[in-house]
Amino acid sequence: MKSMHRGISTMRNFAVCVFTVILWLGCAVAKADTVLDWNEIAVNTAIANGQSPFAQARFAAIAQLAVFEAVNSITGDYQPYLGTIQAPRGASVDAAAIQAAYRVLSTYFPKSVTTLDTQRANSLAAIADGQAKQDGIKTGDDAGKAMIKLRTDDGSSPAQFKTPGAPLAGEWEATPSCPTVGGVQVGAFFHWQHVMPFGIASAEAFLLDPPPALKSSEYAKAYNEVKTVGSHNSTERSQDRSNVATFYAASSPTQVFNQAARQIAQAQGRSISENARALALINMAISDAAVAAFGTKYHYATWRPETAVHNADVDDNARTDQDSSWEPLIVAPCFPAYPSNHGSLSGGGAEVLRRVYGEGGHAITITNPAFPTLVYHYTNFNQILADISDARVYG
């Protein structure tokens, strides 16, 4: 059950593959407020529109790749992702970044267009009127439209579900949060393993080893840890770990690691070109990690902790005791347990951040408006991953 660390480790390797899609960082000196501002707008818009963590990652990747392609078509600093956008000489990089993000977000989130129009107008007002501004807007619009076209029919919709088979020890069964289709509770996001990746070949390329066997001591150790500290009424879980579990259950990897990236980019004075590229890579990694994680999840179809605890009498392991009344602190999501989605997406995002900015020496503050009293400070990415790992065990 405690498969979080395995997911993070594998997603490190996965993130390296994504990272090689575009060339290594070069040197530049310009400031990049527009790229960072519209990254925050992109993430917040997806959240405000009620998107799942996996859809958030996909939309952020599309928006950031559009921004990167728009900026890079003007600066020429890196190998392009699309390579089809032609920018006039002297086009405004800031206008291009603003319009690229706006085009993607306004297309996917029509309910937010009024807010996005205001944000776009405010951002563009800071740029002097003239041909450079107009050329930048045209370049950004072209990049946004090109990314939208590329991702049409990418497998993210329509939703497909998995009907559970006959109950077997260790096999995933529907939990209370699962939707009902045709009178049967089904597994959600079954189709996400087939979403077209941004940088990797396929989910199959990152299939993990199977989870620990039910009879193993490793399984029993993880089982008893989760049963003890992860229950709804656990007396062994501190308030701090309860807070971490609740906070990170509501804070998606896209939200967390883009927040960290913006803070570090500002602190390090990264250029607009560097920021556009880094944010594209980070969100490619997070999104593709979701594809890979769902591939492994539905390949092994491992039962959730509450199913495991309720049915410990059939797991053939003398070191696990059944408790038919056990409930987790956090309601289980409706898909198999192994590997942790949160761990996989976080591991992918953190590894790219690590390679772009370095592991430590940072001043990172992670917040979520839904929990105004909870503020987490970190100096390196391993600290963030440790809290996320704990969150999936304690919650």
Residue ranges and their predicted role:
Residues M1-R12:
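N-terminal secretory signal peptides that target proteins for export/translocation
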Residues S3, C27-V29:
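Glycine-centered signal
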Residues I8, V18-F19, G348:
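A periodicity- and composition-biased signal for non-globular, repetitive helical segments
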Residues S9, V29-A32:
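Extreme N-terminus of proteins, especially the signal/transit-peptide cleavage junction
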Residues A15-G26:
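Bacterial N-terminal signal peptides
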Residues K31-G395:
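Acidic/polar surface patches and capping/hinge elements
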